[in-house]
Protein backbone atom coordinates (compact mmCIF):
# COMPACT_ATOMS: atom_id res chain seq x y z
CA UNK A 1 0.00 0.00 0.00
CA UNK A 2 1.34 3.44 -0.97
CA UNK A 3 1.91 6.16 1.62
CA UNK A 4 -1.08 8.15 0.34
CA UNK A 5 -3.27 5.04 0.59
CA UNK A 6 -2.12 4.39 4.16
CA UNK A 7 -2.91 7.98 5.12
CA UNK A 8 -6.39 7.70 3.57
CA UNK A 9 -7.04 4.40 5.37
CA UNK A 10 -5.97 5.87 8.73
CA UNK A 11 -8.20 8.91 8.22
CA UNK A 12 -11.15 6.66 7.39
CA UNK A 13 -10.70 4.69 10.64
CA UNK A 14 -9.96 7.54 13.05
CA UNK A 15 -11.43 11.00 13.44
CA UNK A 16 -9.23 14.09 13.24
CA UNK A 17 -9.42 14.71 16.98
CA UNK A 18 -8.61 11.07 17.78
CA UNK A 19 -5.52 11.18 15.57
CA UNK A 20 -4.48 14.51 17.04
CA UNK A 21 -4.84 13.14 20.57
CA UNK A 22 -2.77 10.07 19.66
CA UNK A 23 -0.01 12.31 18.29
CA UNK A 24 -0.12 14.43 21.45
CA UNK A 25 0.12 11.35 23.70
CA UNK A 26 2.97 9.98 21.57
CA UNK A 27 4.84 13.28 21.88
CA UNK A 28 4.29 13.24 25.63
CA UNK A 29 5.70 9.71 25.95
CA UNK A 30 8.75 10.49 23.81
CA UNK A 31 9.57 13.48 25.98
CA UNK A 32 8.83 12.01 29.42
CA UNK A 33 9.90 8.37 29.11
CA UNK A 34 13.10 7.71 31.13
CA UNK A 35 13.69 11.47 31.27
CA UNK A 36 16.49 11.10 33.82
CA UNK A 37 18.22 8.19 32.05
CA UNK A 38 21.23 10.27 30.95
CA UNK A 39 23.53 12.15 33.27
CA UNK A 40 23.38 15.92 32.97
CA UNK A 41 25.27 17.42 30.04
CA UNK A 42 27.78 20.13 31.01
CA UNK A 43 25.33 22.90 30.04
CA UNK A 44 22.52 21.24 31.98
CA UNK A 45 24.68 20.90 35.08
CA UNK A 46 25.54 24.61 34.97
CA UNK A 47 21.89 25.59 34.56
CA UNK A 48 20.74 23.24 37.31
CA UNK A 49 23.42 24.51 39.70
CA UNK A 50 22.53 28.16 39.15
CA UNK A 51 18.85 27.30 39.64
CA UNK A 52 19.59 25.34 42.82
CA UNK A 53 21.69 28.20 44.18
CA UNK A 54 18.88 30.64 43.39
CA UNK A 55 16.45 28.43 45.31
CA UNK A 56 18.70 27.87 48.32
CA UNK A 57 20.40 31.25 48.66
CA UNK A 58 18.18 33.60 46.66
CA UNK A 59 21.20 34.62 44.58
CA UNK A 60 20.95 35.42 40.89
CA UNK A 61 22.57 38.20 38.85
CA UNK A 62 22.36 38.23 35.07
CA UNK A 63 25.56 37.05 33.39
CA UNK A 64 25.44 37.17 29.56
CA UNK A 65 27.83 34.21 29.36
CA UNK A 66 24.98 31.99 30.60
CA UNK A 67 22.11 33.69 28.74
CA UNK A 68 18.93 35.09 30.23
CA UNK A 69 17.25 34.64 33.63
CA UNK A 70 13.98 32.88 32.74
CA UNK A 71 15.44 29.36 32.72
CA UNK A 72 16.93 29.75 36.20
CA UNK A 73 13.80 31.17 37.82
CA UNK A 74 11.56 28.57 36.15
CA UNK A 75 13.84 25.66 37.11
CA UNK A 76 14.23 26.95 40.67
CA UNK A 77 10.44 27.04 40.87
CA UNK A 78 10.23 23.41 39.75
CA UNK A 79 12.86 22.42 42.33
CA UNK A 80 10.82 24.20 45.02
CA UNK A 81 7.62 22.39 43.99
CA UNK A 82 8.91 18.87 43.29
CA UNK A 83 12.41 18.65 44.78
CA UNK A 84 15.79 18.90 43.10
CA UNK A 85 16.69 16.05 40.76
CA UNK A 86 17.71 15.41 37.17
CA UNK A 87 14.15 14.39 36.35
CA UNK A 88 12.61 17.56 37.78
CA UNK A 89 15.26 19.69 36.09
CA UNK A 90 14.27 18.32 32.68
CA UNK A 91 10.53 18.25 33.33
CA UNK A 92 9.78 21.83 32.30
CA UNK A 93 11.65 21.56 28.96
CA UNK A 94 9.65 18.39 28.25
CA UNK A 95 6.34 20.12 28.99
CA UNK A 96 7.25 23.14 26.90
CA UNK A 97 8.20 20.79 24.07
CA UNK A 98 4.81 19.10 24.25
CA UNK A 99 3.06 22.50 24.36
CA UNK A 100 4.06 23.10 20.73
CA UNK A 101 1.39 20.65 19.59
CA UNK A 102 -1.60 22.42 21.22
CA UNK A 103 -0.21 25.67 19.79
CA UNK A 104 -0.38 24.14 16.31
CA UNK A 105 -4.00 23.20 17.06
CA UNK A 106 -4.67 26.85 17.95
CA UNK A 107 -3.52 27.85 14.46
CA UNK A 108 -5.86 25.20 13.03
CA UNK A 109 -8.77 26.67 15.01
CA UNK A 110 -8.22 29.97 13.20
CA UNK A 111 -8.42 28.26 9.83
CA UNK A 112 -4.81 28.75 8.76
CA UNK A 113 -4.22 24.98 8.71
CA UNK A 114 -6.69 22.34 7.57
CA UNK A 115 -7.02 19.02 9.40
CA UNK A 116 -4.46 17.20 7.28
CA UNK A 117 -1.89 19.99 7.57
CA UNK A 118 -2.46 20.18 11.33
CA UNK A 119 -1.90 16.46 11.76
CA UNK A 120 1.20 16.55 9.58
CA UNK A 121 2.72 19.52 11.43
CA UNK A 122 1.95 17.97 14.82
CA UNK A 123 3.33 14.60 13.71
CA UNK A 124 6.65 16.10 12.62
CA UNK A 125 6.94 18.15 15.82
CA UNK A 126 6.23 15.03 17.87
CA UNK A 127 8.88 12.93 16.08
CA UNK A 128 11.49 15.53 15.09
CA UNK A 129 14.85 14.31 16.48
CA UNK A 130 15.92 17.86 17.33
CA UNK A 131 12.59 18.75 18.96
CA UNK A 132 12.63 15.57 21.04
CA UNK A 133 16.28 16.04 22.01
CA UNK A 134 15.93 19.63 23.17
CA UNK A 135 12.65 18.80 24.93
CA UNK A 136 14.69 16.42 27.10
CA UNK A 137 17.51 18.89 27.70
CA UNK A 138 17.77 21.61 30.35
CA UNK A 139 18.62 24.51 28.07
CA UNK A 140 16.92 27.61 26.68
CA UNK A 141 16.29 26.32 23.16
CA UNK A 142 12.92 24.60 23.53
CA UNK A 143 11.56 27.46 25.64
CA UNK A 144 12.51 29.87 22.88
CA UNK A 145 10.75 27.75 20.26
CA UNK A 146 7.63 27.62 22.45
CA UNK A 147 7.56 31.37 23.13
CA UNK A 148 8.19 32.15 19.45
CA UNK A 149 5.29 29.93 18.39
CA UNK A 150 3.12 31.42 21.16
CA UNK A 151 3.98 34.88 19.83
CA UNK A 152 2.94 33.81 16.33
CA UNK A 153 -0.34 32.37 17.64
CA UNK A 154 -1.07 35.56 19.60
CA UNK A 155 -0.40 37.71 16.52
CA UNK A 156 -2.66 35.53 14.36
CA UNK A 157 -5.45 35.72 16.94
CA UNK A 158 -5.01 39.48 17.18
CA UNK A 159 -5.20 39.75 13.39
CA UNK A 160 -8.40 37.67 13.37
CA UNK A 161 -10.16 39.17 16.43
CA UNK A 162 -8.41 42.47 17.15
CA UNK A 163 -8.72 42.09 20.92
CA UNK A 164 -6.44 43.68 23.49
CA UNK A 165 -5.74 40.43 25.34
CA UNK A 166 -4.06 38.92 22.28
CA UNK A 167 -1.84 42.00 21.90
CA UNK A 168 -0.89 41.70 25.58
CA UNK A 169 -0.18 37.98 25.12
CA UNK A 170 2.06 38.78 22.15
CA UNK A 171 3.98 41.27 24.31
CA UNK A 172 4.32 38.69 27.09
CA UNK A 173 5.56 35.96 24.71
CA UNK A 174 8.09 38.33 23.14
CA UNK A 175 9.23 39.58 26.55
CA UNK A 176 9.70 36.06 27.90
CA UNK A 177 11.58 35.11 24.75
CA UNK A 178 13.92 38.03 25.38
CA UNK A 179 14.67 36.65 28.85
CA UNK A 180 16.04 33.43 27.35
CA UNK A 181 18.77 33.92 24.77
CA UNK A 182 20.37 36.85 23.04
CA UNK A 183 19.28 35.75 19.57
CA UNK A 184 15.60 36.50 20.27
CA UNK A 185 15.99 40.07 18.89
CA UNK A 186 16.80 38.53 15.49
CA UNK A 187 13.60 36.46 15.56
CA UNK A 188 11.58 39.53 16.54
CA UNK A 189 13.21 41.52 13.74
CA UNK A 190 12.20 38.86 11.19
CA UNK A 191 8.58 38.96 12.40
CA UNK A 192 8.58 42.76 12.45
CA UNK A 193 9.93 43.05 8.90
CA UNK A 194 7.39 40.53 7.63
CA UNK A 195 4.60 42.40 9.42
CA UNK A 196 5.72 45.66 7.80
CA UNK A 197 5.72 43.93 4.41
CA UNK A 198 2.16 42.66 4.95
CA UNK A 199 0.96 46.13 5.95
CA UNK A 200 2.81 47.87 3.13
CA UNK A 201 1.38 45.45 0.54
CA UNK A 202 -2.10 45.86 2.09
CA UNK A 203 -2.40 42.12 2.71
CA UNK A 204 -3.50 42.87 6.28
CA UNK A 205 -5.01 45.87 8.05
CA UNK A 206 -4.93 47.01 11.67
CA UNK A 207 -8.01 47.51 13.89
CA UNK A 208 -9.02 51.00 15.03
CA UNK A 209 -7.63 50.31 18.52
CA UNK A 210 -4.18 49.27 17.29
CA UNK A 211 -2.36 52.22 18.91
CA UNK A 212 -3.74 51.40 22.36
CA UNK A 213 -3.11 47.69 21.85
CA UNK A 214 0.46 48.27 20.65
CA UNK A 215 1.16 50.48 23.66
CA UNK A 216 -0.15 47.85 26.11
CA UNK A 217 1.82 45.13 24.31
CA UNK A 218 4.97 47.26 24.49
CA UNK A 219 4.58 47.88 28.23
CA UNK A 220 4.02 44.17 28.88
CA UNK A 221 7.06 43.37 26.73
CA UNK A 222 9.35 45.85 28.49
CA UNK A 223 7.93 45.15 31.95
CA UNK A 224 8.58 41.42 31.60
CA UNK A 225 12.21 42.03 30.70
CA UNK A 226 12.72 44.57 33.48
CA UNK A 227 11.35 42.18 36.10
CA UNK A 228 13.51 39.24 35.12
CA UNK A 229 16.75 41.02 34.25
CA UNK A 230 16.66 43.10 37.44
CA UNK A 231 16.14 39.88 39.43
CA UNK A 232 12.68 41.21 40.36
CA UNK A 233 14.06 44.56 41.46
CA UNK A 234 17.01 43.34 43.53
CA UNK A 235 19.64 44.22 40.90
CA UNK A 236 18.57 47.40 39.08
CA UNK A 237 22.18 47.98 38.04
CA UNK A 238 21.72 45.28 35.38
CA UNK A 239 19.13 47.54 33.74
CA UNK A 240 20.58 50.98 34.40
CA UNK A 241 24.26 50.33 35.04
CA UNK A 242 25.67 53.45 36.69
CA UNK A 243 23.45 55.86 34.73
CA UNK A 244 21.55 56.87 37.88
CA UNK A 245 24.76 57.70 39.75
CA UNK A 246 25.76 61.33 38.94
CA UNK A 247 29.03 60.94 40.87
CA UNK A 248 30.08 57.95 38.77
CA UNK A 249 29.20 59.77 35.55
CA UNK A 250 31.12 62.84 36.63
CA UNK A 251 34.27 60.80 37.29
CA UNK A 252 34.05 58.15 34.56
CA UNK A 253 31.72 59.63 31.94
CA UNK A 254 28.30 58.63 30.60
CA UNK A 255 29.65 56.03 28.18
CA UNK A 256 31.36 54.15 31.00
CA UNK A 257 28.10 54.21 32.97
CA UNK A 258 26.24 52.70 30.02
CA UNK A 259 28.97 50.04 29.67
CA UNK A 260 27.89 48.62 33.03
CA UNK A 261 24.37 47.74 31.89
CA UNK A 262 23.44 44.13 31.20
CA UNK A 263 22.31 45.09 27.69
CA UNK A 264 25.71 46.50 26.75
CA UNK A 265 27.64 43.64 28.35
CA UNK A 266 25.48 41.08 26.51
CA UNK A 267 26.10 42.70 23.13
CA UNK A 268 29.81 43.10 23.85
CA UNK A 269 30.21 39.50 25.04
CA UNK A 270 28.37 37.76 22.21
CA UNK A 271 29.85 39.91 19.47
CA UNK A 272 33.30 38.97 20.77
CA UNK A 273 32.27 35.29 20.94
CA UNK A 274 31.11 35.30 17.33
CA UNK A 275 34.39 36.84 16.26
CA UNK A 276 36.13 33.74 17.61
CA UNK A 277 36.27 30.35 15.94
CA UNK A 278 34.46 28.64 18.81
CA UNK A 279 32.56 26.06 16.76
CA UNK A 280 34.36 26.10 13.44
CA UNK A 281 32.80 24.67 10.34
CA UNK A 282 31.77 25.51 6.76
CA UNK A 283 28.83 27.85 6.08
CA UNK A 284 26.61 24.88 5.13
CA UNK A 285 27.28 23.01 8.40
CA UNK A 286 23.70 23.25 9.69
CA UNK A 287 22.24 22.41 6.29
CA UNK A 288 24.03 19.05 6.48
CA UNK A 289 22.51 18.45 9.93
CA UNK A 290 19.04 19.29 8.60
CA UNK A 291 19.48 16.81 5.76
CA UNK A 292 20.74 14.19 8.19
CA UNK A 293 18.09 14.57 10.90
CA UNK A 294 15.16 16.55 9.50
CA UNK A 295 14.99 15.69 5.79
CA UNK A 296 11.16 15.40 5.46
CA UNK A 297 10.67 18.72 7.25
CA UNK A 298 13.38 20.36 5.12
CA UNK A 299 11.71 19.16 1.91
CA UNK A 300 8.34 20.54 3.01
CA UNK A 301 9.96 23.82 4.09
CA UNK A 302 11.53 24.22 0.65
CA UNK A 303 8.19 23.37 -0.99
CA UNK A 304 6.41 25.91 1.21
CA UNK A 305 8.94 28.58 0.26
CA UNK A 306 8.38 27.82 -3.43
CA UNK A 307 4.62 28.00 -2.89
CA UNK A 308 4.96 31.40 -1.23
CA UNK A 309 7.09 32.85 -4.04
CA UNK A 310 5.23 31.12 -6.92
CA UNK A 311 1.53 31.52 -6.24
CA UNK A 312 0.54 29.07 -8.96
CA UNK A 313 2.27 26.21 -7.17
CA UNK A 314 0.03 24.26 -4.78
CA UNK A 315 1.60 22.62 -1.75
CA UNK A 316 -1.53 20.48 -1.34
CA UNK A 317 -0.41 18.48 -4.39
CA UNK A 318 2.52 17.23 -2.33
CA UNK A 319 0.40 16.38 0.70
Language model features: what each stretch is:
Residues 37-48, 61-74, 84-87, 276-283:
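Extracytoplasmic catalytic/substrate-binding loops of multi-pass membrane glycan-assembly enzymes
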Residues 69-73, 83-102, 134, 138:
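Loop-to-helix entry region of an early transmembrane alpha helix in multi-pass inner-membrane enzymes
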Residues 24-27, 121-126, 174, 178:
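Short helix- or helix-capping micro-motifs
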Residues 30, 46-55, 67, 81, ...:
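Transmembrane-lumen/periplasm boundary regions of multi-pass, lipid-linked membrane glycan transferases
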Amino acid sequence: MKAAGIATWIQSKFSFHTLFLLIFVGALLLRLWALDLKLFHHDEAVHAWFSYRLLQEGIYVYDPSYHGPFLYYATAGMFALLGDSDLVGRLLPALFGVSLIPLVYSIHRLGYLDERQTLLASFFIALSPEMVYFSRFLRQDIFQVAFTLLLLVALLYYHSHGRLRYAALAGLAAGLGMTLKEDMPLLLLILLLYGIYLLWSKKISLPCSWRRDALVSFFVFVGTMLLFYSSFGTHPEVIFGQILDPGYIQVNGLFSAINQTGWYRAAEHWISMHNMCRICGPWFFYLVLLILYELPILILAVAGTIQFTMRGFSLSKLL
